[in-house]
Amino acid sequence: PTHLHVIATVQDLDLEKRATRFDEPVGIAFANNQKAYVALSSENKIAVIDVASRLVTKHLSIPAQDPRALTVRHGKLYVIPFESNNKTQLSGGYKIDGDLVTFDAHQHSIAHNNVLSLGHVLDIIKHPRVPDKDLFVFDTETDRLIETVDTLGTLLYGLTVDSKGTVFIAQTDARNDVNGRSGTKKHGLAELENRAFLNQITRVEFQKNAAKKPHFIDLEPLPPVHPKPGQAFATPFAVELSPDDKTLVATAAGSD
């Protein structure tokens, strides 16, 4: 009688504030028959759920924006944030150096109304000190964070893990820094070459829980070479491996 029927729901309510703590659940994965994980995208957390009681027992903090896709393989939970960043930011600061800092951010945004202030030289730059955390690996037995991997892409969509623990991530890497020198070098759309993102699959191998250097599989030629008409891809989204690990299958979201 319960076939294809909802048999239960999971909620986590703050009774004093009359608000949910189970906000924007997106991805789900099971550690085993007793424990499940749910990505709470807008909360930047993973809810840990006891399957038998259907109650949230705790949360895992994800210090990145919008964790969505997650999967479990061989006792490890793998989580990627959707908007992971790519170290880019406006070139503001205090001491202007003409490279990473091209305008006084305090004078522009705090001391004066930034809508009224004129004459500031604004670039989009890649700053080495900006965090870019892209992959989080947890031990499903203890829920302890094992490893964090940086710089795997900008918008991270789907992930899968093979039998050896190699991670594959469907992602698009933003090129907003390619024409970012709009202030100092007067960059415009021409420098972007109509390629705002690179469509890629990122491959990450591990050795004793430590990530090796990632490998980027380009789905299209890299600029200045461009795909021929009819050969460009839409956004790489879902990704999955065949049971024998020999074939990687991905979808292109937005394809006609």
Label every PLM stretch briefly.
Residues 15-32, 63-73, 132, 153-162, ...:
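Beta-rich, blade/repeat-based domains predominating
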Residues 33-34, 74, 164-165, 245, ...:
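Conserved loop/turn motif of beta-propeller repeat scaffolds
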Residues 35-38, 77-79, 166-168, 247-250:
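Conserved beta-propeller blade signature
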Residues 80-129, 169-199:
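Short, conserved, GDST-rich strand-edge loop motifs in beta-rich repeat architectures
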